Amino acid sequence: MATFIFSRGNIFFYVNKITIPDLMSDVLLSKLSTELADLDGEIGQIDQQISQLRRKKSELTQKRQAIERKIELKTNEDSDVVTDRWDRDGFPWSDEATKILKEQFHLEKFRPLQRAAINAVMSKEDAVVILSTGGGKSLCYQLPALLANGLALVVSPLISLVEDQILQLRSLGIDSSSLNANTSKEEAKRVEDAITNKDSKFRLLYVTPEKLAKSKKMMNKLEKSLSVGFLKLIAIDEVHCCSQWGHDFRTDYSFLNVLKRQFKGVPILGLTATATSNVLDDVKDMLGIQAALTFRAGFNRSNLKYKVVQKPGSEDECTEEIAKTIKRDFAGQTGIIYCLSRNDCEKVAKALKSHGIKAKHYHAYMEPVDRSGAHQGWISGKIQVIVATVAFGMGIDKPNVRFVIHHSLPKSIENYYQESGRAGRDGQPATCILYYRLADIFKQSSMVQQERTGIQNLYNMVRYAADSSTCRRVKLAEHFEEAWEPSWCQKQCDTCENGNGFVGTSSKESTDVSEAAKTTVRIIEEHLNSAKDGSGRITGNKLVELLTKKLKGSRNREFCEKLIVNLLLEGYLQEDFHYTVYSVISYVVIGSKWRVYNGKDAIKMRHVEESKSRKRKASSSVEEEDVMVLD
């Protein structure tokens, strides 16, 4: 641009004149800006692709590591070979062990893996025992205490379970006790003196992890016990609680990593009903027992029949259906119903009573005398059904439980396996029924979202419940990394009974749900944009309601629920949690996978055939918000 000056009389004029080079400069600048914007767009797309590739690489790396771990375990030593080496007679103490088993515990023979674990710890080997619920884990440390004529320290998270075991041991003439906040000064003094006396007849001391972590006096007494040669074994019950990758991590278990260093030469025995390879490796690392022997029982309980039932839309319908099932299939037989909350327990128990079923609720907020009364009434048979939270079950010794019903979705496959495993301990046929619907996912996710692997564990449970085409035992075997063929199930699950139990997806029709998925995302976007401040978030239940209306005539509510579950599990949608003063609310938002979705590739979902039992009127109203109230 150039400036010209000319005058007319005494007046001077300044004129700006645009030159050709100036015009060229503006055009060039505009062109460069356009190119820059295009490059930014391409870079953004590449960033998204890189992000997607990184996630894919992470998934493949995890799969590779899992396969490598399996190869390593198989190469080093087959678990059956390890078990065979230890699960036999011929050890110096074998005859005495059998004698104690029969004369002290009044048992005729060892259960699977009990003898192997006993022989290992008597040989001063560290070991981890994975035995299903009711498999007899407690004998693995109780008998060695008597066999070694010394002290077994038992770390257990539940005082109630500890007290039950102590009563049982004392009835067998075995001196044992616990040290906790309820222990009298006289009893505490007696125990402390006993565990530091090598000639004492005291055999088992039960403590919680908190007790060890907070009591220097306790640790000092145990060191003295070791110095006089009296401490023979440290057993850690529910050892999966050590792992942050587990389904029930407890921070107080972190202190236990000092035990191996502090009590050198004392074998550590970890016990649990469930543990994946990841959890098992983490537990061993945390406790410093990387070379520990592993004794793992197979996951399969052949006498248990697994079923998943579409949960009715209203609570009244649900309890009515449960009552009908109990009356029709389990008349006069003992059972457990697990609920998510204490409120649910009380409501379900009350509803069952109205149907003439002898039921009683059980949860941690009851007075101890009421809780004990419910427990004893159920054990004695006066109460047919106990309706409980997860507070009920650990250490329960009732072999003739014929059914376990889950009123709501458990938080992990491990929890489900352990809780359902309380059925049929006598080896006779028993049934495990899981009632499942979309709303339960959001109630449970609001509770577990702060746990390190809470959502991951929950979604694994959802995959089990939502898959109506794969053998239930195949799903369990995959999770616990065991080999399983659907034919071995013998129609002992609902999918195999219906002829659907297969492995893979190729043999079952899949439906292209791309358009329905796009409609789902549009609803979320419209809801979000409807609020000027961007606060128009949508809950899962509301999304189902709107999607069902949108697809009215072509798809029913059941399809919409299954679609949303599928999109959540595949990462096209995700949950977003928000806190209020009294609750945690789950909202459904667009997931990372949708952000890189090109809109062309087909999104497929396995075909759903609506069964007669599912052709019920589902409530279209949002009966329960996706909210978990904070107590």
From Swiss-Prot:
Keywords, in A-Z order: ATP-binding, DNA-binding, Helicase, Hydrolase, Isomerase, Metal-binding, Nucleotide-binding, Nucleus, Zinc
GO biological process terms, semicolon-separated: DNA replication; double-strand break repair via homologous recombination
Cofactor dependency: Zn(2+)
Pfam families documented for this protein: DEAD (PF00270), Helicase_C (PF00271), RecQ_Zn_bind (PF16124)
Region (Disordered): 610-631
Composition bias type Acidic residues, residue spans: 622-631
Ranges spanned by the short sequence motif DEVH box, renumbered to the chain: 237-240
Annotated residues for binding of Zn(2+): C471, C489, C493, C496
Reaction it catalyzes: Couples ATP hydrolysis with the unwinding of duplex DNA by translocating in the 3'-5' direction; ATP + H2O = ADP + phosphate + H(+)
Superkingdom of the source species: Eukaryota
Matching NCBIfam families: recQ_fam (TIGR00614)
Function: DNA helicase that may play a role in the repair of DNA that is damaged by ultraviolet light or other mutagens. Exhibits a magnesium-dependent ATP-dependent DNA-helicase activity that unwinds single- and double-stranded DNA in a 3'-5' direction.
Protein's name in the database: Putative ATP-dependent DNA helicase Q1
Organism: Caenorhabditis elegans
